[in-house]
Amino acid sequence: GVEFRMNVEVGQDVQMQELLDEYDAVFLGVGTYKYMRAGLENEDAPGVYDALPFLISNTYKVMELEHNQPFIDMAGKKVVVLGGGDTAMDCVRTSIRQGASNVICAYRRDEENMPGSRREVKNAKEEGVKFMFNLQPLGIEVDAYGKVSGVKVVKTALGEPDDAGRRRPEPVE
C-alpha cells in the first residue's frame, strides 16, 4: 500500500534515513514555494495573478479544504498566461476548467522550444487553449482604473543560443 504523510517536515518531524529504511520508495513532493516575477510594468495591477497562488487556491477549492487566501476564479474571463513550462500549462488548463471564456498561452519562443511537457501542451490544445508563439511580453496594459486590460508584446525570432544552449528569443520589427 501507499502511505501519505502530508505537512511533515523532513529533518524535524521525521528523519530522511527513517523513511528510507522503512519504505521501498520515497516520493518527496516539496512543491514550488517561490514564484517568479517577470519584472513587467504593471504586473501588480488588479487582474494580474501569480501562478502559484492561483493554483493553490484552486486546489483548496476543489478539495474543499479551508484556506485563508481568496479563491481566484477565472469563470467567464479572458485569460492570457505568459510562459511555456508545465506551470503555465497547469494555469491554462485550470482556467479552462474554471470556465474562462477564452484562454491564450503566449510564449516567447516557438512551440518546439517550449520547456513544458509535450503531453501537457497537447492536452491543453484539446481542452481549448489557444497558443501564440514568438511573443515576448513587454508589460501589462491597464485601463483608466488601473485594472489589467491587455498585455503589450513584441514579436520574436530565435537567435543565438544562451549559456544553457537554448536559442534566445530576439525582438523583430
Which residues are covered by each model-predicted region?
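A Rossmann-like FAD-binding core segment of flavoenzymes
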Residues: 1-36, 62-70, 97-173
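Glycine-rich dinucleotide-binding loop and its adjacent helix/turn
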Residues: 2-5, 35-98
